[in-house]
């Protein structure tokens, strides 16, 4: 089922990448996910927005997209995990046929599906989320049983995106509780081989839906920003390719994003 919100998401690019960022992106969320990440509010049993998801037939979907086009041509497909939507290829094609730009979020678990979408020119900006520095950490974060889902497949997805001409790739990881410079370096090394990839760091977005017993908290904002500045200074490959979203304000407001 879908949750659709008009002009809500701030594009996480500067505009220098040939992407129109004058308008925010419409958000199209799919309710299903194959991960249960500890920091994701949608994984919480307390998540209270489930009633905002609705089924849409093809004619209804087309009508909604056409109406949204009048106020902006950027569309962000997210979730949940949008590759689980059995109609995702058709949904994306509708947006592209109407002249839209597609930002596509994925946890990277389904690289073959993503490759199909890329090969058909249905993705303009691919955002892939990392779940840990090691396969073991990724398993613990994503709460899945098969390591390939949250590790090997993720790298395949990044590689497919990086090798697709004209597609921008953003790799995201979420920081919480504490982070060291050495950890940021290790994360950057994992994706450094993929030419042109952007490295995005989200400080934990606090939510009333996150159970307090998890003990998750934001990293000190100034400390994290200073570590990222150091990374860019010492590793020139990342200059103008690091994106920092410190809190939930930066999700929906462009001036809440720091580009380094």
What are these language model-derived features?
Residues 66-67, 74, 83-213:
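Conserved AdoMet/S-adenosylmethionine-binding subsite of the radical SAM
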Residues 28, 104-106, 243-245:
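Short, hydrophobic beta-strand segments that form beta-sheet elements in well-ordered domains
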Residues 1-53, 248, 254-260:
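N-terminal [4Fe-4S]-dependent radical SAM core
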Residues 43-77, 86-87:
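Conserved alpha-helical substructure of the radical SAM core
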């Amino acid at each position: 089922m879908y949750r659709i919100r008009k002009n809500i998401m701030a594009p996480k690019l500067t505009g220098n990448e040939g992407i129109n960022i004058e308008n925010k992106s419409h958000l199209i969320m799919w309710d299903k996910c194959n991960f249960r990440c500890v920091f994701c509010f949608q994984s919480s049993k307390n998540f209270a927005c489930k009633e905002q998801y609705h089924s849409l037939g093809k004619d209804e979907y087309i009508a909604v997209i056409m109406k949204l086009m009048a106020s902006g041509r950027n569309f962000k497909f997210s979730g949940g995990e949008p590759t689980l939507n059995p109609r995702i290829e058709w949904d994306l094609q509708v947006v592209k046929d109407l002249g839209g730009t597609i930002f596509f979020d994925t946890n990277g678990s389904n690289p073959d599906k993503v490759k199909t979408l890329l090969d058909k020119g249905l993705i303009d900006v691919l955002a892939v989320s990392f779940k840990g520095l090691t396969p073991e950490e990724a398993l613990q974060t994503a709460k899945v049983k098969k390591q390939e889902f949250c590790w090997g497949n993720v790298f395949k997805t990044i590689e497919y995106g990086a090798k697709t001409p004209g597609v921008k790739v953003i790799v995201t990881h979420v920081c919480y509780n504490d982070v060291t410079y050495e950890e940021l370096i290790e994360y950057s090394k994992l994706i450094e081989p993929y030419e042109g990839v952007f490295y995005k760091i989200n400080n934990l977005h606090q939510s009333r839906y996150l159970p307090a017993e998890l003990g998750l908290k934001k990293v000190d904002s100034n400390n994290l920003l200073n570590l990222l500045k150091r990374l860019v200074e010492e590793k020139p490959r990342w200059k103008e390719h690091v994106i920092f979203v410190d809190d939930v304000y930066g999700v929906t407001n462009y001036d809440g994003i720091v580009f380094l």
